Amino acid sequence: MVFFPWWISLLFNKGLESWVTNWWNTTHSETFLTDMQEKSILDKFIELEELLLLDEMINEYPETHLQTLRIGIHKEMVRLIKMRNEDHIHTILHLSTNIICFIIFRGYSILGNKELLILNSWMQEFLYNLSDTIKAFSILLLTDFCIGFHSPHGWELMIAYVYKDFGFAQNDQIISGLVSTFPVILDTIFKYWIFRYLNRVSPSLVVIYDSMND
């Protein structure tokens, strides 16, 4: 049950890779680039041209050597464009894989409802048998680990992994924005849950949690 989504994702990723690559290269005769990608490649091209011009001004190379350098710049541009094209293929591949895996996992959770009920009852019994002190300590440890002052780097790694898993190109600004807002939202939801649910179900647990938190 735990490794089932990962296995399905891996199988579909390998199975769909060749099909998605062939479909993209067949249906798109021209390379598709976003404005940001075009600007990035153009800036790289200008940078290489300026380096070539500077090198040509400083050193007196024969024409054959300059021609070789220009061919090298052309090959580098082709490599960058191919790399961007592969990024689009990976985006479609990962997005399709995740959607299919979600549908399969959702169907499995519905069809295997009996097994999930058994697992849920076992977890509830296990948590019920724990003392309030252990529960409060576990909650405090989990909250400090997930939304404490030392957790932003962990959130950054996790969000970057999810971002990459869906096939999107890494964007530091978006990741930084999610890291600065998502833990705050999660902290607010958790405090509301403590106030509404735990205060009604187990007031002693809330008292112990507040004492340990202070």
Curated annotation (Swiss-Prot):
Its main location: plastid. GO terms for biological process: potassium ion transport. It is found in: Plastid, Chloroplast inner membrane. Pfam families: CemA (PF03040). The chain crosses the membrane at residues 92-112, 174-194. The keyword Plastid applies. The lineage of its organism: Eukaryota, Viridiplantae, Streptophyta, Embryophyta, Tracheophyta. It is a multi-pass membrane protein. InterPro entries: CemA. Keywords: Antiport, Chloroplast, Hydrogen ion transport, Ion transport, Membrane, Plastid, Plastid inner membrane, Potassium, Potassium transport, Transmembrane, Transmembrane helix, Transport. The keyword Transmembrane helix applies. This is Potassium/proton antiporter CemA. It catalyses: K(+)(in) + H(+)(out) = K(+)(out) + H(+)(in). GO terms for molecular function: antiporter activity; proton transmembrane transporter activity. It comes from the Eukaryota. Contributes to K(+)/H(+) antiport activity by supporting proton efflux to control proton extrusion and homeostasis in chloroplasts in a light-dependent manner to modulate photosynthesis. Prevents excessive induction of non-photochemical quenching (NPQ) under continuous-light conditions. Indirectly promotes efficient inorganic carbon uptake into chloroplasts. Belongs to the CemA family. One of its GO terms (cellular component) is chloroplast inner membrane.
